[in-house]
């Protein structure tokens, strides 16, 4: 299997032992983007990056992760210009707001259809980091499906730990468009088998973890293999790493 700059991260993810290789890639991309925005390069000071963060903003999850990263000044500077645009736009929409009737007549807008409400929903649903993650993950999926042609990589997929439910859905849908029929005939049965086998494996680990708290097991030896069963079980279901500490800038 020939490796090059695009395939290395995907191969590394499948070799990582993570419950979902795409969660591994997503975490790597997310941390890299946080570091890009607030890290030593101070991208938040570049006009083009600031213009984009002013436009896109950050979702709740990534606003918290940016705060946790530890560069409070960088966060403050980004919020300064973001607030300028936010106030300008709010003022513009507020000036044109017309209070809808409680029971609007036919053809009249409801309050949910008011431009200011539509604008506010769009602002809350937009995130600079989410956009970059989506773009990067699309490229990783494309690389993954290109690698499927390689017998050595297929073996990694067959022997892997499956995927989280979130990325499982993405793979099932994307494979339909990315793979020819000959490869889909291998892909779908393989993914479904590895998903089922590994869900059973994780369920067994959770059972083992819970059993250690049974009073009948008092004084028994703890099994280190199931110590992290709860966090791995959560990753399988939701595609997250709940045991990860906050990602912080280097001291």
Where are these regions (language model features)?
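Intrinsically disordered, low-complexity regulatory regions of eukaryotic proteins
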Residues: 1-162, 166-251
